[in-house]
């Protein structure tokens, strides 16, 4: 048969409830109804309704088994008569003895309900007489609400059946039963033991007993309620204990599989409190309250209204409390402690899963205030909400044990405190978290026509704040966490007064828990409907907060995991020591990042709500919170794989050991800030003012600007490893990246395959764009002209920048630092400060530099357009104004007029009628455009070298040692470097700029006066410029030692600009191959180029004339410069210098200085080279232009045609180069030894006590350092101009002839500079005893050697020669001009005569003619005298002199004709020529000895312009043949300088005044010979 489920309507549910109530009342009314059988007791009632039951006769075991059809106890109660004699009952008064007992009182009164009716117990039940155990057995269910038991040693309520066997009570059964034992709010009270036995229990009230045992489920029990067996129910049989219990002992057991026990209330046990079930949940009760209140002023009508309301809701919580001496909650499945408090001596919580968490409470409040009146409105709604977390708290005076037998232990906002030990164990994971509390406030409103500004709009403000209610675990002694899976703590606080042990089979995660704060402000409104402007705002701020986990132990701390240990943004500390270990995973000490995001979106409107300004910004900022692993004693970290420390601290007050089977990485953490910002503004300006006399201007200008800026900034948060002593050991690599290593008392050691100290970058990148768009209009008016002008301008500038600052790794070691790399060792911008010994070793060692840099790039663009229209009528208004003013002036006092006369209107009109110079008004239009763009960039970089500062430095490389500007400094002892090869490069600081610009513009103008004439003018120009600059500054490595400097290299050693300074010791460098000390080089290069051009065109036409003109100009220039400057190395050693090379020893311009001996040794060649610097400059230019014009004019009397033109062309070239060489220096107070197969000293400056030069198989050469200069520059500038005018009268007559007048001219400029120069810096050697042993030749070329005595052997020849210095220099400058005209007005006489006016013109002309005759006579006399002098000095022949006289005669006549007639030919010349040719010895090579000079020369001796001198002794060359050769040279300098004035009249003045003189063009010409000689005393 199928069953059907029916759903009741609300009315049906109400009817069913009433029926149940009536049935219950009826049952109460039946009371206790005995069964009709022989087990039915006698039941009677006494006054007040109390029922008295005379129990049946007990059996041999003292059990009185009573059976009932109904068993219900009302409030008057019931009395079970177990008395053998009469007495007084507490409930029923006087009672007689129970006759059924037969003299034997019952020890157990068993009341069994044999019907199907449940029992309702509302009152007390008393055992009258002898106390006995009480059992009520009703399988149909029992309800107790205010029931209790009197004079019972044990009271048991059993929803089940008694089990009898052979008439004997064996126990009880709740099998196959699902009925309920219900305890109401009025509870249950007894002084004895209490048993509650049922498949299900629902308790809502207070239960008080000596001991309480509650067993649920489907079970069989013994007579004394021991569980014998259980069966799995078909459905869950959950029990609820929502009241309270108070007892000496409380036991709650639910055996039903899949069922649970739920506890809510207060449970107090003097001794044990235990709960056992499949599922256990302790929960607290939440009370809900709400309110809703309207304002007293509320109203609504057609004119307005007020709505005020205050409403809210709240939740309050009554926490569940479990108190007992020993508290045990054991669940087969899930065990949940929710918002409850447990207090006891020892507390044990167990479940397959164990959860201890909290409960959330919500509080809400809303205030509404809405008001309106006609068109005015103002509405505000305020809301407040609070989310509160109520966590669980466990307090154990002794120990607390939390166990998950199958799954996880989860703690959320739990506070657990154990007076002794706290142990948490999980078969899987342990999770320790906090719960987030929130508080939010908001205000939302809108308004219309509010205040005098008539504001209309809406606004909204909200603010949300989150706080963390963290889990807290505290142990008075030890704290232990053990998980077969992972252990994760977030934002938790864990502390033990003694030791902490955290052990996980998988991972240990100590992390942060994050909360968020949020604030939003919006405001959108307008004034006067937008006419008065407006404002928009939408701003938001979001802030993330990281809450660290804190794990601390006053004793020792142990973290152990098979896989990973992850500590993120948290603090771990063991006061008496700490140990962190992974078997196969990583140890990660990491930082946590918190993020703050702020957004701004604002706008302000001006009239008509046009946007006046706006601002948008979004800022995203990260903040790093580093982890801390600290011990006040020893700290050890052991990893089965890698150790990663990121932006965090590991610190030990004692020894710190980090051991890894993989890598050890100590890195900085990055925190990034990103900003995106945009601003706009609109400005409107106007003006109205007088700009000239009676001229006025008015106009406006609008400017809109936009600024967009984005930036990204990356900052590094370094890690630090610190301990009294530090030991880092990795089976693989060790890397420090932008982080620190410190020891406070002792040594530090680092060991790995590869070891690296590298830098990280702090970087900021910006991108900025400024855009301006502007335009305007202006109007000008007044008595002279009217006009208008419109303009538009667009400007944009885009700038990008990047700034990079390196954060190098650093060490600060109080003792010794030992770094051992099985393979390679790398330093990049690292800094080491070691009080003791710095020792490092590896296969390859690199000490490299990094570069801080700043770069910027700017692009700009601008475009402008102007349009103007003007009407100029000043040609009319100004004469009119003057005529009126002249008439007025005639009546003023002081004028020769009749003062009584007044100016009348007729007089003024008469003056105006006489005006004849009025001009036609001019109308014109002008349009101009201009624009341009540029690109500019700049890059600067500064090298940051690795530095090592220690008491003593030992470097040992099995292969390569590589330095880049490294700084070595030993403060106590010496520096020792050992490698197979050693390369030391100089670092470079760089500065670089580039600039490119293109700009141009054009203008067109059109004007007319009559409408039949028109003038058009067009012009344009453009230019492109390119500039570039590049500079580098070199910095070599520095070796500074308080003791010795010892460098031993198996093969080649190369040092670039290096500085060696052994302040109290000796500098020794040994190389098995080449040893090179090369110069470093600074560089400078720049270039500039320019291309420009312009053009113009003008056309004018009238009915009478035509005018045309135009032209163009163009040019280009380019200039470049390259320069290198030598930066040489230095070597000092107070106790001496020793350089030994297994092959070549090369020193390039190096400076050596010592107070003791210096030894330079090479198996092959010792080469002291000079340092070299160069300068190169090149350029060229090319330009030219042409202008031409043509005009024609017709009048009534004549016609004229004119034309003009000009042209100019320039070209030039610059080519210069100089090479400067400078030798090195050797200064020592001890002896100097130079020993090699061959020896070469170039330009060296040597000063020593005694010197020994030895070549084992080659030559010894001491030579000068040669420098050169080269110039090849030239330029030419050519110009031409001409003009011609033809004038033809309408009727050509002798008085009015046709004329043709011209004026032509030109110029030529030429500049030439050519130079080739060679100079020498002689090598110098000053010493006491000089010993020279050369296996082959000895050569001194450009050298000066001075010694007290000279001895030695020369296996070959002795060659001593001086060096010539040469300078060939030619400079030519020519400036020539020429002009010719046939214009009579250009006559010098006519010009002067006409200056006196027509009356004096003839007199002045006659006087000038007479003066000219006297002047020419004087010139002739002067010439005759001068020519005779020149002829005498130069030896000119008579024939030649005659020709010159004839020429000067023609010149004289020409001068006269030019002065008295048309100006004709004019010319000027300025010519300068300089020629220098020097080729001679300026510094003689010499070998000088104060005493004897004794050289055993096997070959010949040759002196070329050189000297051998023995000042106090003899010269002995061992019988060598001597050849002396002189060097011939010369010094030559010549020049010519001619300056002729630009006109013949000026030339005549020169001749008359004697200003022209002729000198010999040769200034110097001499022969300079340098003789070779040998001199002795």
UniProtKB/Swiss-Prot annotation:
Cellular component, GO annotation: cell outer membrane
Keyword Signal: yes
Biological role stated in the UniProt entry: Bacterial hemolysins are exotoxins that attack blood cell membranes and cause cell rupture by mechanisms not clearly defined.
An MF annotation (GO) of this entry: catalytic activity
Keyword terms, alphabetized: Cell outer membrane, Cytolysis, Hemolysis, Membrane, Signal, Toxin, Virulence
Protein name in UniProt: Hemolysin
Pfam families for this protein: Fil_haemagg_2, TPS
Region of interest: Disordered: 437-467, 1081-1103, 1169-1188, 1213-1232
Keyword Electron transport in annotation: no
Polar residues bias: start-end ranges: 454-467, 1081-1095, 1169-1184
Protein's organism: Proteus mirabilis
Superkingdom: Bacteria
Subcellular location: Cell outer membrane
Other facts: The conserved amphipathic domains in ShlA and HpmA may be responsible for pore formation.
Gene Ontology biological process terms from the UniProt entry: killing of cells of another organism
Range of residues in the leader sequence: 1-29
Main location: membrane
Family annotation (InterPro entries): FhaB/CdiA-like_TPS, Hemagglutinin_rpt, Pectin_lyas_fold, Pectin_lyase_fold/virulence
Biased composition regions of type Basic and acidic residues, renumbered to the chain: 437-446
């Amino acid at each position: 048969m199928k069953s059907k489920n029916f759903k009741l309507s609300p009315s049906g549910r109400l009817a069913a409830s009433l029926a149940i109530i009536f049935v219950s009342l009826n049952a109460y009314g039946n009371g206790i109804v005995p069964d009709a059988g022989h087990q039915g007791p006698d039941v009677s009632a006494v006054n007040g309704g109390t029922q008295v039951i005379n129990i049946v006769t007990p059996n041999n075991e003292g059990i009185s088994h009573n059976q009932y059809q109904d068993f219900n106890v009302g409030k008057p109660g019931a009395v079970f008569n177990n008395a053998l004699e009469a007495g007084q009952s507490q409930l029923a008064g006087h009672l007689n003895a129970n006759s059924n007992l037969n003299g034997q009182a019952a020890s157990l009164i068993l009341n069994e309900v044999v019907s199907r009716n449940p029992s309702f117990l509302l009152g007390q039940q008393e055992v009258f007489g002898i106390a006995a155990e009480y059992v009520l057995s009703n399988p149909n269910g029992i309800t107790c609400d205010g029931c209790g038991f009197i004079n019972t040693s044990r009271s048991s309520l059993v929803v089940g059946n008694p089990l009898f066997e052979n008439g004997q009570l064996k126990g009880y059964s709740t099998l196959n039963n699902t009925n309920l034992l219900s305890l109401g709010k009025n509870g249950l009270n007894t002084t004895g033991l209490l048993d509650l036995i049922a498949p299900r229990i629902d308790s809502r009230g207070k239960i008080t007993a000596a001991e309480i045992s509650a067993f649920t489920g489907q079970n069989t029990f013994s007579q004394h309620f021991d569980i014998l067996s259980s069966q799995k129910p078909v459905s869950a049989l959950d029990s609820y204990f929502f009241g309270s219990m108070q007892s000496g002992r409380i036991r709650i057991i639910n055996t039903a599989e899949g069922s649970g026990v739920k506890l809510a209330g207060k449970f107090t046990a003097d001794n044990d409190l235990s709960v056992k079930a499949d599922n256990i949940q302790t929960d607290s009760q939440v009370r809900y309250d709400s309110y809703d209140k309207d304002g007293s002023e509320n109203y609504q009508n057609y004119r307005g209204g007020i709505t005020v309301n205050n409403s809210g809701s709240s939740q309050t919580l009554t926490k569940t409390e479990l108190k007992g001496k020993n508290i045990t909650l054991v669940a087969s499945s899930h065990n949940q402690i929710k918002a409850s408090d447990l207090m006891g001596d020892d507390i044990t919580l167990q479940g397959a899963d164990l959860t201890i968490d909290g409960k959330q409470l919500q509080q809400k409040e809303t205030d509404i205030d809405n008001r309106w009146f006609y068109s005015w409105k103002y509405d505000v709604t305020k809301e407040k909400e609070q989310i509160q977390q109520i966590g669980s708290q466990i307090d154990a005076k002794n120990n607390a044990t939390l166990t998950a037998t199958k799954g996880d232990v989860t703690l959320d906002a739990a506070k657990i405190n154990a007076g002794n030990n706290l142990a948490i164990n999980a078969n899987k994971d342990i999770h320790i978290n906090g719960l987030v509390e929130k508080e939010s406030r908001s205000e939302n409103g809108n308004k219309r026509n509010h205040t005098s500004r008539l504001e209309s709009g809406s606004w909204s403000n909200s603010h949300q704040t989150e706080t963390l209610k963290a889990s807290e675990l505290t142990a008075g002694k030890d704290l232990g966490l053990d998980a077969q899976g992972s252990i994760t703590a977030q934002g938790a606080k864990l502390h033990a007064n003694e030791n902490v042990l955290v052990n996980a089979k998988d991972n240990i995660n100590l992390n942060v828990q994050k909360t968020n704060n949020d604030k939003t402000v919006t405001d959108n409104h307008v004034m006067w409907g937008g006419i008065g402007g407006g404002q928009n705002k939408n701003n938001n701020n979001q802030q993330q907060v990281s809450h660290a986990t804190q794990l601390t132990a006053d004793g020792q701390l142990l973290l152990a995991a098979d896989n990973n240990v992850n500590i993120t943004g948290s603090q771990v500390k063991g006061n008496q020591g700490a140990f962190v270990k992974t078997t196969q995973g990583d140890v990660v000490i990491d930082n946590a990042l918190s993020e703050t995001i702020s957004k701004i979106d604002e706008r302000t409107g001006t009239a008509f709500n046009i946007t006046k300004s706006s601002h948008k910004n979004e800022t995203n900022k990260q903040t790093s919170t580093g982890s801390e692993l600290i011990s006040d004693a020893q700290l050890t970290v052991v990893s089965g794989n890698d150790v990663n420390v990121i932006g965090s601290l590991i610190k030990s007050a004692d020894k710190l050991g980090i051991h890894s089977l993989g890598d050890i990485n100590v890195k900085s953490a990055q925190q990034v800030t990103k900003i995106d910002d945009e601003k706009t503004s609109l400005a409107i300006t106007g003006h109205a003012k007088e700009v000239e006399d009676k001229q006025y201007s008015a106009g406006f200008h609008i400017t809109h600007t936009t600024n967009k800026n984005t930036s990204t900034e990356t900052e590094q948060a370094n890690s630090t490893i610190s301990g009294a002593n530090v030991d880092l050991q990795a089976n693989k690599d060790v890397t420090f990246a932008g982080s620190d290593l410190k020891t406070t008392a002792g040594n530090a050691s680092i060991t790995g395959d590869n070891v690296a100290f590298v830098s990280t970058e702090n970087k900021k990148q910006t991108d900025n764009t400024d855009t301006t768009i502007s335009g305007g209009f202006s109007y000008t008016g007044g008595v002279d002209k009217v006009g208008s002008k419109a303009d538009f301008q667009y400007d944009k500038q885009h700038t990008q920048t990047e700034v990079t600052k390196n954060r190098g790794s650093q060490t600060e070691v109080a003792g010794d630092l030992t770094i051992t790399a099985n393979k390679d060792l790398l330093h990049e911008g690292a800094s080491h400060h070691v009080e003791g010994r710095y020792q490092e070793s590896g296969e390859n060692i690199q000490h490299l530099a990094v570069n801080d840099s700043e770069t910027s790039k700017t692009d700009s663009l601008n475009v402008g357009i102007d349009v103007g229209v003007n009407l100029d009528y000043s040609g009319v208004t100004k004469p009119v104004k003057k005529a009126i003013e002249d008439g007025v002036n005639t009546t003023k006092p002081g004028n020769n007029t009749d003062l009584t006369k007044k100016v009348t209107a007729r007089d003024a009109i008469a003056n105006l009628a006489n005006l004849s110079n009025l001009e036609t008004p001019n109308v014109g239009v002008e349009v101009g455009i201009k624009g341009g763009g540029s690109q500019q960039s700049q890059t600067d970089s500064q090298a940051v070298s690795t530095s090592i500062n220690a008491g003593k430095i030992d470097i040992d490389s099995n292969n390569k040692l590589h330095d880049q500007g490294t700084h070595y400094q030993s403060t106590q002892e010496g520096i020792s470097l050992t490698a197979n090869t050693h390369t030391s490069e100089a670092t470079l600081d760089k500065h670089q700029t580039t600039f490119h610009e293109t700009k141009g513009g054009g203008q067109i103008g059109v004007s007319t006066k009559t409408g039949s004439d028109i003038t058009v003018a067009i012009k344009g120009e453009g230019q492109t410029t390119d500039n570039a600059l590049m500079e580098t500054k070199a910095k070599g490595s520095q070796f500074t030692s308080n003791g010795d400097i010892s460098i031993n290299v198996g093969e080649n050693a190369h040092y670039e600009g290096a500085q060696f300074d052994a302040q109290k010791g000796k500098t020794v460098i040994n190389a098995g191959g080449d040893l090179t000390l090369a110069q470093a080089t600074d560089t400078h290069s720049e270039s500039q180029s320019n291309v420009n051009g312009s053009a113009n065109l003008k056309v004018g036409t009238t009915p009478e004339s035509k005018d045309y003109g135009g032209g163009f100009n163009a040019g280009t220039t380019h200039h470049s410069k390259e320069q290198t400057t030598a930066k040489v190395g230095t070597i000092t050693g107070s106790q001496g210098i020793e350089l030994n090379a297994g092959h070549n020893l090369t020193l390039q311009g190096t400076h050596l200085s010592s107070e003791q001996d210096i030894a330079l040794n090479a198996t092959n060649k010792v080469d002291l080279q000079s340092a070299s610097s160069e300068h190169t400059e090149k350029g060229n230019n090319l330009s030219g232009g042409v202008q031409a014009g043509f005009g024609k004019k017709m009048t009534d009397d004549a016609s004229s045609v004119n034309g003009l033109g000009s042209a100019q062309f320039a070209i030039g070239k610059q080519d210069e180069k100089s090479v400067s060489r400078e030798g090195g220096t050797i200064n020592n107070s001890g002896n100097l030894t130079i020993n090699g197969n061959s020896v070469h000293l170039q330009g060296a400056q040597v000063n020593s006590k005694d010197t020994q030069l030895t070549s084992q198989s080659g030559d010894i050469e001491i030579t000068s350092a040669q420098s050169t200069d080269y110039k090849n520059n030239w330029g030419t500038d050519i110009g031409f101009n001409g003009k011609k005018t033809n004038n033809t009268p309408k009727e050509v007559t002798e008085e009015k002839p046709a004329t043709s007048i011209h004026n032509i001219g030109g110029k030529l400029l030429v500049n030439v500079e050519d130079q080739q120069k060679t100079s020498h810096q002689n090598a110098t050697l000053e010493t006491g005893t000089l010993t020279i042993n050369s296996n082959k030749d000895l050569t001194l070329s450009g050298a000066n050697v001075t010694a007290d005595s000279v001895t030695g052997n020369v296996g070959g020849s002795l060659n001593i020669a001086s060096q010539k210095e040469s300078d060939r220099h030619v400079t030519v400058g020519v400036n020539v001009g020429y002009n010719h005209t046939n214009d009579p007005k250009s006559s010098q006489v006519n010009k002067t005569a006409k200056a006196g006016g027509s009356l004096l013109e003839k007199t002045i002309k006659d006087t000038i003619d007479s003066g000219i005759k006297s002047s020419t006579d004087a010139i002739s006399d002067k010439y005759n005298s001068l020519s005779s002098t020149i002829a005498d000095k130069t030896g000119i022949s008579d024939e030649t002199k005659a020709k010159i006289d004839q020429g000067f005669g023609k010149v004289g006549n020409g001068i006269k004709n030019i002065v008295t007639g048309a100006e004709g030919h004019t010319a000027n010349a300025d010519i300068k020529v300089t020629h220098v040719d020097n080729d001679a010895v300026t510094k003689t090579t010499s070998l000088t000895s104060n005493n004897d000079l004794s050289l055993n020369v096997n070959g010949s001796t040759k002196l070329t312009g050189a000297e051998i001198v023995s000042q106090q002794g003899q010269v002995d060359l061992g019988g060598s043949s001597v050849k002396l050769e002189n060097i011939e040279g010369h010094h030559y300098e010549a020049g010519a300088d001619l300056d002729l004035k630009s006109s013949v009249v000026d030339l005549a003045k020169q001749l008359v005044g004697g200003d022209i003189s002729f000198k010999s063009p040769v200034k110097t010409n001499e022969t300079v010979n340098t003789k070779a000689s040998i001199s002795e005393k």
